[in-house]
Amino acid sequence: MSFIDSLNQLLFPTRCFGCAALGLSICSNCRCDWHPHYYKTHISQLNVHSAVPYSSTASRIILASKENGLKGADNLIINAIFHVLIKADFVNHNIRLVPIPSSPSARRRRGRSFIVDITKSVAQRSGLPLSDSLELTRRVRDQSGLDATARAHNMQGAFALKRGAYPRGDLILIDDVVTTGATLHEAARALRSAGFNPIAAVTACLAQPLR
């Protein structure tokens, strides 16, 4: 460990993302809430494969990654998504990973496109190619607090293919969490309407039941 790393550890000791206990990025108690398994759900014409049920621990991990860019939280999400790709037997097939894009305002605020960055790391680990093909075509509301009907209306027609994008082969959408499925449904619709083939989605978390 370098001097800088040692100093950082002294000034900013590792704490559990779930409960803030010192020592590990996720403690043994919170690991019960973030222990990748394999869950399969279905929305519209899309199978959704997920790793962990959404919980307060999962929420804190996602926020630590999404809003604070903490590498330890990134790694937990990357590991969960990679776990599902293995369990669903998507690795070693002619499949491309398509991340759900952040809005322009979120990219400016966070300094990155959260799921695009996560998917890049998943692609490197899995050997599956990344196809950053989608973009938001208009401003959408924050989905937290919206019910299923409001989320569907909020996301309707929100995605389109980027200019020049041509995501060949079978496509897997990647996102952090599926709640009602509105975002994944619209992303899949945008790909299908352009003649491409989204066959499934993979998320780190899923709400139970889908709301």
Language model feature labels by segment:
Residues 1-211:
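Glycine-rich phosphate/pyrophosphate-handling loop used in enzymes and phosphotransfer proteins
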